[in-house]
A protein has these predicted regions:
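Conserved class I S-adenosyl-L-methionine
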Residues: 153-163
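A short SAM/SAH-binding and catalytic strip from SAM-dependent methyltransferases
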Residues: 237-252
Length: 348
């Protein structure tokens, strides 16, 4: 995906305008791209998308920051280095295919078109394949295995924003004795998720393992982030929250996670699958390629309705501590691993 995104930067003329400005800040580049390319930075997350591009180009050495850190100069002429040139369309997994689909929609979106991908019936298959990609499935397994070691195999589990049901299926495999409750603010995925739950029950029955029915909650019970969950205090020993965090509005993050803490039992466990925004110090997201992947992911999924992006890892840590969580990955109390992609938190 990196070659394709860099090709977009050259093809659209973003790099050319950056070079023409010599040294520039975000405001100057926004003005130039609005004037010359028709980009609309006055609505939604489009201005943030430009900052994502800048950070990606810095990461790859195409732009160089000044000492102040908020202005840049162009170091490249757009001629690709080895590994930066598109090699033609190759078959990818659900994640790569999703990024490509989104990237094709970026030019129109930057010029003011409405977000073309939403959590609706038209895009069920798109989300099905993306959220079920190999990387996310492997991460769910790691997350659930570690959560089980801290919560016990018979925990009551809430799957927040269950989507197509990939997390439910993994949870039933990893935690066969768990009492699972699933909730989402849309019911467009309900049929697929319930099919996965039924398959999970069938597999557990063949293996002679107990498996409780899933309890389902939908948009008539919960309207989404910013609304309280319809459960009493301390209702669950564990909460699984995979791939939904970037859809929380920045001004609602404290309230959303405070409510998750409310529904957790004392010493309950919260497991989160997301990505962390690459920090300039390379402390929270040190791996170059994971940094590049996070920026590509954040930029491309920005064309999806409701996307607010990956949060700052340090701000996340401070928020969780302030709200009454502690890290639970190891005896040292780390909150996250894998360059801040997997989080396990305990309710203090």
């Amino acid at each position: 995906m990196l070659p394709e995104l860099l090709s977009f930067v050259v093809r659209e003329g973003v790099l050319e305008r950056s070079r023409a400005l010599s040294v520039f800040g975000v405001d100057e580049l926004c003005e130039a791209l609005h004037r010359e390319l028709g980009y609309d930075f006055f609505r939604g997350n489009r201005r943030r998308m430009l900052r994502l591009l800048i950070d990606l180009l810095v990461e790859r050495g195409w732009l160089e920051p000044t000492r102040s850190g908020d202005r840049w100069s162009c170091r490249r002429d757009g001629i690709p280095l080895p590994g930066e040139s598109p090699a033609g369309a190759t078959e990818g997994d659900g994640q790569v295919d999703f990024f490509r689909r989104c990237l094709r929609l970026v030019p129109g979106y930057l010029r003011g078109e409405e977000a073309p991908i939403a959590f609706d019936a038209e895009n069920v298959r798109v989300w099905e394949e993306f959220l079920g990609c190999d990387e996310f499935q492997a991460c769910r397994s790691v997350l659930l295995d570690r959560m089980a070691s801290t919560s016990g195999a018979s925990a009551s589990l809430l799957d927040l924003c269950y989507g197509p049901g990939w997390g439910i299926e993994r949870a039933m495999d990893r935690w066969p004795e768990a009492r699972i409750t699933a909730i989402d603010f849309t019911d467009v995925f309900a049929a697929n998720a319930k099919c996965r739950a039924e398959r999970g029950h069938a597999r557990n029955a063949v293996r002679g393992r107990p498996s409780s029915p899933v309890e389902w909650f939908g948009p008539s019970d919960w309207k989404g982030f910013g609304y309280p969950l319809p459960f009493p205090e301390g209702a669950f020993e564990a909460v699984l929250f995979s791939c939904g965090d970037p859809y929380i509005r920045p001004d609602a993050r404290d309230a959303v996670y405070a409510d998750l803490r409310r529904v957790l039992a004392p010493d309950g466990t919260l497991g989160i699958l997301t990505r962390g925004y690459p920090d300039p110090e390379h402390r929270h997201v040190p791996s170059h390629w994971l940094r590049v992947t996070a920026l590509i992911h954040d930029f491309t999924e920005s064309v999806c309705a409701g996307w607010h992006g990956f949060p700052d890892v340090g701000e996340n840590q401070a928020m969780f501590s302030r709200l009454g969580f502690r890290g639970a990955w190891n005896p040292g109390g780390a909150m996250n691993i894998m360059d801040s992609a997997l989080w396990i938190l305990k309710k203090r």
